[in-house]
């Protein structure tokens, strides 16, 4: 053990504005990099230490695995010795996708779904609820005492909006894309012959103009001068087959054919149903608008997933509560259970409360679990990363923190300090770039650039 390296040795660092820097960085301690803007703080932290730490770890994996992962390029440095595997908690974490929420990102939703699977009142198909029972966890048959119908208690997976518990209409996104009628004819002074109906120009054959004429619509009159009946045919007309005579625009070719009418709205809906990639979506999305799903009211959950009740509220309502309020509500669950259910309830609830603690310490108690992760600020997403890092209980990792105090209320600085100390206690190393003096004072070592 006496020969175990105590420092990372960096020699000849030339990344960005670093000019042949040599520096030793103590391991298993908090090291802060300070300096004026442009001095190379982030270049040393991210461009050298994180880049080399993550790259070398990935290079130790098999070729098959590396092909499926993106790795950093080799840093411009003569030598880096004894750098551990590195994880970066970026100042600007990547924006999550549409299916990610505060609840999924923190994994709090996993515990909450387990509560609703094991501890909830479940109901039969006739709407009769039964009290919480150990028979659910034991996977025993449950019969409604009122109508004698068999009761199905959904599993945690059946309560997940990214899986079996998804709303059938929106697919678990909470939003639906519908045709934006105003986008179909953007310039209402044009005639149909002049290309007034935009989807027919980009998503459909141009001869749809000829079919529309056969439907009884005047195609040589400005759209804003057409009758309501003609406009209705353009927007919503029936899919009737018409015999048309058509002539190509740029040649003398002409002919007759039977063609089915696609109204402007259906043209977009049909194109949307056939989208297979981002390129295809870009052609269609300009004719769409997003609205809250009318089926699930934005909760993302199916009707069945919203049925189980704990303390008289469903999973959807629990996810809408701010974390501060939700924690207090969860604390009351064990005492609301029948005596034989209380030990299991405490175990499940304690798991939720344990994960919540760090998030509350980091000042995220105002967020609800259903908050779309894409709407979170960069500071909020970074604090989620920090809380997850502590929960994972890793050891021997170099954590590179790029301005972790950004967006943090002064009252929550000590929560951040507690997180960093926990990471060190578990045998990790921290390298941070920050301007907050309270954070910098906690460092064991300073590197002044």
Name these PLM-found stretches.
Residues 433-435:
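H-loop/switch region of ABC-family ATPase nucleotide-binding domains
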Residues 438:
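Conserved Rossmann-like nucleotide-cofactor binding loop
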Residues 421, 427, 443-449:
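H-loop (His-switch) and adjacent beta-strand-loop-beta switch element
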């Amino acid at each position: 053990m006496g020969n175990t390296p105590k420092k990372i040795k960096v020699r000849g660092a030339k990344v960005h504005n670093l000019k042949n820097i040599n520096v030793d960085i103590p391991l298993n301690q908090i090291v802060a990099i300070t300096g004026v803007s442009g001095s190379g703080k982030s270049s040393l932290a991210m461009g050298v230490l994180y880049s080399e730490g993550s790259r070398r770890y990935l290079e130790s994996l098999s070729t098959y695995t590396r092909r499926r992962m993106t790795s950093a390029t080799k840093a411009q440095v003569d030598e880096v010795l004894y750098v551990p595997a590195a994880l970066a908690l970026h100042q600007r974490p990547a924006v999550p996708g549409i299916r990610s929420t505060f609840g999924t990102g923190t994994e709090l939703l996993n515990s909450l779904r387990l509560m609703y699977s094991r501890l909830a009142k479940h109901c039969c198909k006739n709407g009769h609820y039964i009290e919480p029972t150990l028979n659910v966890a034991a996977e025993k048959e449950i019969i409604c005492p009122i109508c004698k119908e068999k009761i199905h208690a959904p599993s945690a997976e059946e309560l997940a909006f990214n899986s079996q518990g998804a709303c059938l209409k929106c697919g678990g996104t909470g939003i639906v894309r519908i045709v934006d009628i105003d986008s179909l004819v953007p310039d209402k002074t044009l005639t149909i012959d002049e290309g007034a109906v935009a989807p027919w120009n980009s998503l459909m054959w141009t001869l749809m103009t000829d079919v529309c004429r056969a439907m009884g619509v005047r195609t040589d009159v400005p759209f804003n001068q057409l009758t309501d009946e003609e406009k209705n045919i353009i927007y919503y007309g029936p899919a009737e087959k018409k015999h048309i005579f058509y002539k190509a625009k740029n040649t003398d070719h002409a002919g007759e054919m039977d063609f089915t009418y696609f109204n402007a709205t259906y043209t977009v809906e049909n194109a949307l149903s056939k989208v297979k990639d981002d390129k295809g979506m870009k052609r269609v999305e300009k004719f769409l608008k997003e609205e809250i799903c009318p089926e699930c009211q934005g909760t993302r959950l199916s009707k069945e997933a919203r049925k189980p009740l704990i303390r008289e509220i469903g999973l959807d309502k629990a996810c809408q509560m701010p974390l501060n309020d939700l924690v207090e509500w969860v604390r009351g669950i064990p005492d609301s259970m029948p005596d034989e259910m209380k030990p299991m309830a405490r175990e499940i609830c304690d798991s939720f409360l344990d994960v919540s603690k760090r998030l509350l310490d980091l000042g995220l108690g105002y967020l609800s679990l259903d908050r779309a992760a894409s709407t979170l600020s960069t500071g909020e997403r970074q604090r989620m990363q920090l809380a997850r890092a502590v929960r994972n209980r890793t050891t021997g990792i170099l954590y590179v923190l790029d301005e972790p105090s950004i967006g943090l209320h002064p009252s929550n600085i000590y929560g951040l300090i507690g997180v960093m100390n926990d990471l060190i206690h578990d045998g990790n190393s921290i390298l941070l770039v920050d301007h907050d003096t309270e954070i910098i004072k906690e460092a064991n070592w300073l590197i002044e650039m």
